Amino acid sequence: MPNELLKNKKGIIFGALDENSIAWKTAEKVHEQGGSFVLTNAPVAVRMGSIDLLAKKTNSIVVPADATSNLDLDNLIDETMKHFNGKIDFVLHSIGMSINVRKGKHYTDLNHDWLTKGWNISAASFHRLMQCLYNKDAMNERGSIVALSYMAAQRVFPDYNDMADNKAYLESVARSFGYFFGKEKKVRVNTISPVSYTHLTLPTICSV
């Protein structure tokens, strides 16, 4: 039931691909509660997915950005602050990808080039994003930055493969950068793990 919990709050939501995405569902709820946001995803994902439908439904704009590119992230933040005429209140990082999982590589036989690419997209991108936000002083005080993690960052889930390592690094970045964001900017940084969902990076796992 809408009660405008996020009225006048502005932000960025990463990772909405289609209506099965957690980021998509989050965007719908944020809109329902009165929040406004810019939607973003990698350019190829924007072309493949149906994010424009979500933008229309939530009265949002779409700014494509490669989360592994500082230039793209800088442009995204600049465009967002220009759109809202000021700083923002929240960011959702809902990004994850493992080529090793998609290619069926066992954890004991990983392709390390794929491992590095997946780590860069799934975890290092969170540091890049916060670094850009921090350097541009883009967050309002008492704002919130949230990234999606998974319990495999702390426990053994063999089929989650190298994504478990990516999520562990993601959580470490949240703690480390969260210290500086909290101390200097009074901004909260957290990760959250869904209880049950179908992960698009893990086609062999349903409702993990």
Residue locations for each model-derived region?
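Canonical Rossmann dinucleotide-binding motif of NAD(H)/NADP(H)-dependent dehydrogenases/reductases
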Residues: 3-39
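Conserved hydrophobic beta-strands of the Rossmann-like cofactor-binding core
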Residues: 10-14, 88-96
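Catalytic loop of short-chain dehydrogenase/reductase
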Residues: 16, 21, 96-183, 196-197
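Conserved glycine-rich Rossmann-like NAD(P)H-binding loop of the short-chain dehydrogenase/reductase
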Residues: 35-49
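Conserved Rossmann-fold cofactor-binding substructure of NAD(P)-dependent oxidoreductases
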Residues: 68-82
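Conserved SDR Rossmann-fold cofactor-binding beta-strand/turn motif
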Residues: 188-195
